[in-house]
């Protein structure tokens, strides 16, 4: 059992707990498409979980799901969702619909850009830079979104946040990846980084998010996650537990939280998608990001 409590006044004070056990199938996350330069096919907005729009950012398909009255709320608070995919399987997917409804109902927009299986690589981060510019400068959204990482989306969210800590209001998600060595593994990640396995291994101290999480801790970026204790795809110990340990070692234990889902793996258990504590945290941080942007 792992228990953490938020103490900083700007956060919701959440007492965390271990959730129950439900069986679920492991998620297949082995697609290896690497970020490309060709113009991506733009999916129709009707394919989104909730009302919004789709658009291009430097040839990459992007989306935003908007709350009602978005034009009257400036700057617009928003959640930056990772991993966004428009080619099977699509993310965000239908399992997350209720969660995103909570975000939208709270007046928080949700947006993301498809950078393929970039695994947090510099090439993918360049697209993220352009997406951030589009959302904040061109569309008037808050300059500090809350990052959200699902599974390997954690690599994308954390790697960009580490390079742009002053532009991030918080980071949350469920069973997120922070260590390239476990998932996807260096063999699979190397092409996305445009390196050989040996080159990537040598560059891990400066490229692997888990080796650089101290940047977020020292910058005071709040974080909250839920992760299963029997996850064999993205292990708790190598990823979110390592995240927590880094925050603790850098004097930031009061701004990080983790719910350990007892008996859960890398699956579609509803508790991951309906975690009230995670949802409240993300809404709170996105809202604070809009306040800080004024």
Description of each model-found segment:
Residues 9-21:
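Bacterial N-terminal signal peptides
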Residues 24-74, 189-192, 287-294:
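A domain-start/cap signature at the N-terminus of enzymes
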Residues 70, 181-248:
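The feature captures the conserved acid-bearing segment of alpha/beta-hydrolase catalytic domains
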Residues 73-84:
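Short beta-strand element of the alpha/beta-hydrolase
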Residues 91-110:
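Short amphipathic alpha-helix adjacent to the substrate-entry channel of hydrolases
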Residues 119-140, 159:
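Alpha/beta-hydrolase active-site loop
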Residues 136-138, 142-191:
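Primarily recognizes the serine-hydrolase "nucleophile elbow" in alpha/beta-hydrolase
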Residues 237-294:
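C-terminal catalytic histidine-bearing segment of alpha/beta-hydrolase fold enzymes
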